Each structure stands twice: as C-alpha cells, then as structure tokens.
Amino acid sequence: NELAQTALFKILMGELEPDEGSVKWGVSTIRSYLPKDNSPYFDGNQMELVDWLRQYSAKKDDVYLRGFLGRMLFSNEDVFKPVNVLSGGEKVRCMLSRMMLSGANVVLLDQPTNHLDMESIQAVNKGLEAFPGVVLLASHDHELLTSTCNRVIAFQPDGTIIDKYGTYDDYL
C-alpha cells in the first residue's frame, strides 16, 4: 500500500526509524529522494524558482541555472515565479531538478509521475533510462515501470517478498 511504500522510503532516507533492524548504506553512496509529498519544500516559501534551485546547485550563475530550468520545461519568466505558487507538476519538476543537481548515485522516487503532464512524464522516463546509478521507484504508472525497471521487488500482503530480475511485464 502507498503508506507502507512511503514509510519504507523514509526509513531508507533516515527520515523515519524502523520498528526493527537497521539500514546501512555504502560509504560511496550519495542518495537523493523525491517524496510523494513535497509540500515542505514549497509551502510558505517566497523564493523565486531560480534562487530556490541555486541553493541545491554547485554552479550558482544565472545562465547555467536558467538553462537547466529551460531543459526542465520552465520558460523565460517562469524562472522568476515564487515557488509557493507553482502547480503540482511544476513542483515535481523542481524536485527532479534538485535531484539531478545532487550528484546522487542512488535515487528514490515515490510516485514521481503524480501531477505531471505527458511531456514531463516522457522526460522522466528518458531521464531514468539514462541514469547510470540505482533507481528505487514506487509507482502506479505501468508505462514508467515497464520502460525503466530491470528488477522488481514486490512486498506481498502476507509479508513475503518477491525479488525478480527482468522487466515489470516479466514480473506480471
């Protein structure tokens, strides 16, 4: 269920303590997380989009950041919008931008295509297909799962775990 997958991701990111056991990541692991609820990053925040992204970028100059945001489908004056007025899809694109700038080699995405239009969903698909690291993905988007997954770990209602190498369609 969705509550459990979100809890698992929060445990993996160290935002929530597990009831039992522990999580240990390798020393060279750099993680980035796209939470299903991204409101804490935006609610009440009056920063302009370009300045919001600047805080997550090693490169701080406007030309680089505006070019980056352009590739994320933000045009011209959109980069000066306050982040608290962005649409749900725009906020997801902001969070994906933040992830790309993080240098992560492991990304955790909790329902990444929620609130996105078709063009943005296709861009997410392409980006994940090209990502050289590890992707942990929770999604109801069959197309996204089919195009990006080469291993499925499914938690069953009875507590068993299915771990299958292959595509999502192979799992089904």
Feature locations, PLM:
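ABC ATP-binding cassette signature C-motif
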Residues: N1-L172
